[in-house]
Amino acid sequence: MTIKRIIFSDIDLKKLDDIIDVRSPSEYEVDHIPGAINLPVLSDKEREMIGTIYKQNSKFEAKKLGASLISKNISNHLKENIREKNRDWLPLIYCWRGGQRSYAFATILDQIGWNVAVVDGGYKSFRKQVSEFLNKNIENYFLILLTGNTGTAKTKLIN
């Protein structure tokens, strides 16, 4: 099989079973693609540790440790989160820039036999596309800011 690189704007979300964000929990918490689930390949602590080694010591040593931790974490996700997925499961995977973390996860899923795709450019690309769309189309939308205390029938007004 082959891992597909897909530009987010070209994706038919209705055909996907899951959108998987493999970034760390804190990155996911800040923001993520709507509907995505977080299956991090590195914890926040692991990501920080590898980043420190990468910058202060050796890129090679950081990559070796990263590969070890990522392999362990992907193995855990296979056992705990996705082992029940059938052969026809269609996941879309992304990380920050569509690089090493998403491809590590995608490569293993691909080797198992799932038809997997990676967001080209990762979450950063998705965010840029959303921003460009809004900047080009803002005049087509009418925004209303609705405020008020609890119990003042805001929900009734919206409905």
Predicted features and spans:
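N-terminal extension/subdomain marker
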Residues: 1-11, 16-17
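Positively charged, proline/Ser/Thr-rich regional signature most characteristic
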Residues: 13-86
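Catalytic cysteine-centered active loop of the rhodanese-like fold, especially the PTP/DSP P-loop
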Residues: 66-119
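A short, basic/flexible loop-to-alpha-helix module at the beginning of a structural domain
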Residues: 79-84, 128-137
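Pre-Walker A (Motif I) flank of P-loop NTPase domains
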Residues: 88-89, 140-144
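Long, charge-dense
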Residues: 118-131, 139
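Glycine-rich phosphate-binding P-loop
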Residues: 142-159
